[in-house]
């Protein structure tokens, strides 16, 4: 996806335009790739082309923009010269409340060598994100992060385990070989997946919030169905009640459980994806790019919720993200993927230089 986005960006830059509008152009790019792109946009603006840059990434806004405006709930709530404001003020205006500073929540948690997931010599043929030889183990009860540059294979791992792309190698779940080539096997075994492609894979855009939330649990576990002998019928009342519960728990902004998902904002759609995964009561949850393209308030809600369900429900989580700071803030360990393989596994409080070296392919001290 990152490479496709860059191609689209280049096509726009080569047209003879007086104004360019970019809507979340770096959402699928890593931090280093986004930085190079911002330099390009700055050069375009310096040449006399006006740029409207729409982004939830505050670092990018502060670095690139001359002026900043904030829309919240469809209204203009803030307008200022960038040099006269700061990230904290912008963030608070975006969400309408003060935000807590990021911190490393899970530093120095201890786990036994009880592995819920063991991946060995795993290869996934996912276009633009192939892995060549991935091996790692995930301890029961931890939040395991997967990071790396776009195009190096990090997002293909969860997709391969859930049978989305041709794969080979060994995947052990609770000590037993997982037949990941069989569609739906991971779901049947008690895993769940929140895809990075929420519109293409994660949601039924023309269906209601309630239907989207209960769909997987209904199909896999036969819940939310009224049974009449050999026949069954969708239990709309029960599904609406459960959807109402999840709407409140995840602070989903909507008109109710009957609202069509395609009409929700990106952040609220992502919360529906999260609710859908959790209603199947997984023991192991994979989340891929959970905060891509959503506002800072929704990001905080989702990240806090991941930590909450990990600690309160004991759900083991594998989180793939291009945002290293997010991995730092919630993960117990972080694997860096480069050139289709695991370059190293680090603790979240490991020196930044070690993360940088692993991402550059130069290697770093392993603090696992």
Each language-model region and where it sits:
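Glycine-rich phosphate-binding loops of nucleotide-dependent enzymes
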Residues: 1-368
